[in-house]
Amino acid sequence: MTGELIERQTPKRRITDPAEALAALERALPGLADHRRSARAALDWAVVEESLGTALPSDYKYLAEWYPTFAIGDCILVSLPEPGEEHLVHRGFQSALDVLVDAWLEPGLGLPSHPAPGGLLPWSESDEGDKFMWTTAGETPQEWFVTVAGRGGAWWHYEGGAVQFLAELCDSTLEPWGLRLFDSEVTPC
């Protein structure tokens, strides 16, 4: 897919506390809290991260510990590991990486795929084929930022974490640059 990097969007303040990021997402999606687990799930992150060859951002892990996989507005699928199925997570990430490499990455963009340093690691997608990825740059996963590959070929960066990105996309704080509008209904998957 031919694309070009448009530019970056930067949040007014990057949320680094996972609980604060999740609270922002729950405010942006009032129906999300209806699907919150009654207790924080104990996921074996060592298995997940070893299979991926990298640690993952704490906001994503915190979201997965409190919520199962869900869809926003029947548009954006937020796939999350399930307790007891951590050994299967690598398959989903690898499948998304294969699609990214085969159909999306253009040499001119200068955006490599994971596991290359600073490589892209997909974490979500829309029903129209938009890809939401981490750019794995920085000393720790907490410094990673979101890269969006729009179905129309436009690529852009959001200088915050995945959970803050979802919150600001849903509450219209950020400009959706090529992403379609969707309602805020939350559906467990």
Predicted segments with their positions:
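Short polybasic amphipathic segments
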Residues: Q142-A149
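Intrinsic disorder/low-complexity segments enriched in polar/charged and small flexible residues
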Residues: V47, P68, E106, E125, ...
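Short, solvent-exposed loop/turn segments that connect beta-strands within catalytic domains
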Residues: E86, G138-Q142
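Low-complexity, Gly/Ser/Thr/Pro-rich intrinsically disordered linker/tail segments
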Residues: W177, L181-E185
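Compact, glycine/acidic-enriched structural inserts
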Residues: A154-P176
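Short, surface-exposed beta-strand/loop micro-motifs that present aromatic residues
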Residues: D130-A137
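A surface-exposed partner-binding patch
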Residues: M1-E128, S184-T187
